[in-house]
Amino acid sequence: MNSHTKQKIGVFGLGKTGISVYEELQNKYDVIVYDDLKANRDIFEELYSKTAIAALSDSRWQNLDTIVLSPGIPLTHEIVNIAKSFNIPITSDIDLLFAKSKNLKFIAITGTNGKSTTTALISHILNSSGLDYPVAGNIGVSALQAKASKDGYVLELSSFQLDLVKTFTAKIAVLLNITPDHLDRHQDMTCYIAAKSKIFDRMDQESYAVINIDNDYCREVFIKLQQEQRIKLIPFSVAQILENGISVVDDKISANFCDDISFELQHNSESFRQDEFQGEPAEPECIKIREHRQDLQNSLVSSFMHYAVPFNKNLQGVHNCENIAASYAVAKIIGVEPKKILESISSFQSLPHRMQYIGSINNISFYNDSKATNAISAVQSIKALDNIYWLAGGIPKEGGIEEIKPYFSHIKKAYFYGQAKEIFANTAKNIVDFVICDNLEQAFDLAYKDAVGDNAEIKNILLAPSCSSYDQFKNFEERGELFIKLCSILSLRGLITGSS
């Protein structure tokens, strides 16, 4: 968009993204807005101007230069049909940020699970090294609300956001994993994979694609990009030691990066130093990776650099090993020394509601994984722990908890609540001991009482609902906050100690 011309812009969707777009554009363009939800329109009217609100029946929507669409709006919506009928280009807040920050470097992360943790971890590593890479996107900070940066941005991008980008081009793009999700929006897996793959659009030989080749769908994307030969490819794995790439296997990070793969950036932060790490760091306590493929390669290429994975309660489990592998790869491409990467992994504080360690009492540890809104996501935290008192429930997703059945051996007892309680109970019947509860509070209380009576050395109370939250909560955040509050009550009684 040309800021020298008073163009006419439509902003459709008035959630966090739409509001940030309006604030960015209102003084530069003639802007009209709309949202299907009256509550959002009412909030906008209170904050800004009623005159900017225009229903889709208003002819002004047919005479716009551009429409900025929020990612929550499906491409089957009437507004998209209007845009097509009147040849109005559709753009997004991601493209707007890119347009005004083209001199900066963009690191983009997508995947079905693990996006937020990886986005935050990469930002933490880079910022701890003296760089300036704030997070934005699907992580809770909309693109246009991100703080100004000197070096670049780390963006979490959902499939909905990727469907909308037209000009955004990442310098480094990460594909963590792909499992069936959002098929109500994307119709089928082919469309879903195509949406995820858009993160690599417009990238070239000066760009890097970091891809998890353990995942079948991701490996297909990797092979396709390999055939195209237009992007530098960095594979990563937690199942095998790669001859060229990043692996996190047997408590070790193994990196085989040739000298010519280093990423040449113009760093604006004066405190950044690309020192070569000399020697292998002391071996800290390591994350235990329980599962590897039988065909695991035991031999290391002589040129590998390999380091112990620093133990961090907030980064447990195979899924977090994937997040660590991807983050290490990105930081290595940028030029951060291995010692600094490992220190940053060790000091990383997890995002709320994502396998968040709350604290412990008498060998009972409390973990909040409220973000685990489906079984595939919950599997990751369940695999990471043993002797689990599992809190699960809400509005069930298709397939229920069938994906978790192979890992029921990790669960000591389950506490089911919400709309899913009977469905989950039928799946667990005769396999796992369980209790049906009215709500999360009751489930928490019963789990705590049972864990106190357990003489085992290690006990874990885990909230991994495997469901959406809308039957009893506004969102997964509110659900997770209640779990934290229940833990805090124990803390006030002097029971829980040492959350980190």
UniProtKB/Swiss-Prot annotation:
EC main group: ligase
GO molecular function: ATP binding; tetrahydrofolylpolyglutamate synthase activity; UDP-N-acetylmuramoylalanine-D-glutamate ligase activity
EC number: 6.3.2.9
Protein's GO biological process: cell division; cell wall organization; peptidoglycan biosynthetic process; regulation of cell shape
Keyword NADP: no
Cellular component annotations (GO), alphabetically ordered: cytoplasm
Catalytic activity: UDP-N-acetyl-alpha-D-muramoyl-L-alanine + D-glutamate + ATP = UDP-N-acetyl-alpha-D-muramoyl-L-alanyl-D-glutamate + ADP + phosphate + H(+)
UniProt xrefs under InterPro entries: Folylpolyglutamate_synth_CS, Mur-like_cat_sf, Mur_ligase_C, Mur_ligase_C_dom_sf, Mur_ligase_cen, MurD, RPE3
A Pfam match: MurD-like_N
Compartmental location: Cytoplasm
Positions annotated to bind ATP: 111-117
Predominant cellular place of this UniProt entry's protein: cytoplasm
Domain RPE3 insert: 260-306
Family assignment from sequence similarity: Belongs to the MurCDEF family.
Function comment: Cell wall formation. Catalyzes the addition of glutamate to the nucleotide precursor UDP-N-acetylmuramoyl-L-alanine (UMA).
Protein name per the record: UDP-N-acetylmuramoylalanine--D-glutamate ligase
Source organism (scientific name): Rickettsia conorii (strain ATCC VR-613 / Malish 7)
Lineage, top ranks: Bacteria, Pseudomonadati, Pseudomonadota, Alphaproteobacteria, Rickettsiales
